[in-house]
């Protein structure tokens, strides 16, 4: 409720201003008690010719006559000589007119003066009270040209390189920046110049902001943090003014670090878009370029910025002398994920059954923010279940929640639909388990999760991969189509549950043909040109650069890949129909089936054939290692 108090004060102040204006206008223009002016000759004529019209005459010692008629009319006449005109006073008295005397200044005058002074004083008090309230809220009403940067002083919530993991190369790159901030003379002695700007590039959540804070923490210098969107406002020129103010603050607190997060909000390529771009944003960018040229790196100011869209930044921003060093933060590998998990878990009570190495292997593709969220989700689950330590099952459930969404056990599914979902998921699992290049199955579940998923089959790669072979892609497409193949094999009809699988399989097959050159018929050619459309604000689009005949051949090749993979999936499930039925019954009973249990059952059922498959998978893994 405290946040609404300034709004109430503003409303009260506005109401008082309106009432005061109404009162003043009414007093000056509509006051019926205000006297009218009358000449002395008109008064003498009325006194002698129409004395019956006059009700009262008040003679003031300052020479003012106040004449009131019987009709309620009120007149004022300035006639200081009237006090000596005894004849007229006698005539009025004889005609029954009341004639009285009064002091020069009436008490009503002082009442009005005092009332106005009190009212104006109250308005001034309210005005200064509002100004004080606004000043307490960072004086936002009058300092919109000031920089919005948040300044962290040395020692305040200090972050160091010990709090950063999974980006060892980036840390090594930035250690020399720390040395420069601690001892600039060490570099100037040998004529070395530190980069004026350092651009941190990487996907969202990889720790760009954290790494910038760690550099400031290691160097123990002030840290200015501002978002690129904080520069541009409604008013023209505000962005450029804020840039100037930011660098003035930095110069006053040197040595320091200025960190601009999401710099693409203000540093986008100039002139992009219809109409030539955004003038205010470009003016802000121009001022930023000028400021980066204007300061001497020997002052100890290092400008750092972060973006996940380096392709749309203006070239002038990236030239030497501005952001002349790029530091790339990539998705962490299994070792990096393990170190990140250890950092986030070090202040939490972890049970003895938790294996951080296994969790790192099962979180392929997770970035630092995902892993922090994973640990926090596991802690929440442990607290919800009344445990004082976080167990491995909490982490497993947290992984499922992050990947597929929270379980929705309250959703009512008919027995027939539940059986269809079970066959669909087991179809995925069996096909993927029997393909030598598919990712191992980690878990099968028919518990609804997230928005629309009625079940899921979670496959996690055994290790990080940076290259994918053609056969691995084909096995992946075949595994995606295993669910639909099981539905058609068992129920002789298909459902809408495979829509997402078909979409992913088709897209993967099209990329194999058009992007990876993996079509035997069309050969190692790239079809479709990736361009940056200037009229789309430098957005990536894929332009068609081939004929209608080639387009037809591409569609035919995509159809061939998907159809052959689908037939292959049906062939596998037809051959292992018995195992499919047994696993479905087990899954319907338990609702969740772990990957290890699945492989154990298949090895028991298939014997030597499953052993040979394990050898094929191991051989594929050793080829990747080489």
From Swiss-Prot:
Its EC number is 3.4.24.-. This is ATP-dependent zinc metalloprotease FtsH. GO terms for molecular function: ATP binding; ATP hydrolysis activity; ATP-dependent peptidase activity; metalloendopeptidase activity; zinc ion binding. Residues 29-108 are periplasmic. PANTHER family: ATP-DEPENDENT ZINC METALLOPROTEASE YME1L1 (PTHR23076:SF97), METALLOPROTEASE M41 FTSH (PTHR23076). One of its GO terms (biological process) is proteolysis. Homohexamer. The lineage of its organism: Bacteria, Thermotogati, Thermotogota, Thermotogae, Thermotogales. It comes from Pseudothermotoga lettingae (strain ATCC BAA-301 / DSM 14385 / NBRC 107922 / TMO) (Thermotoga lettingae).
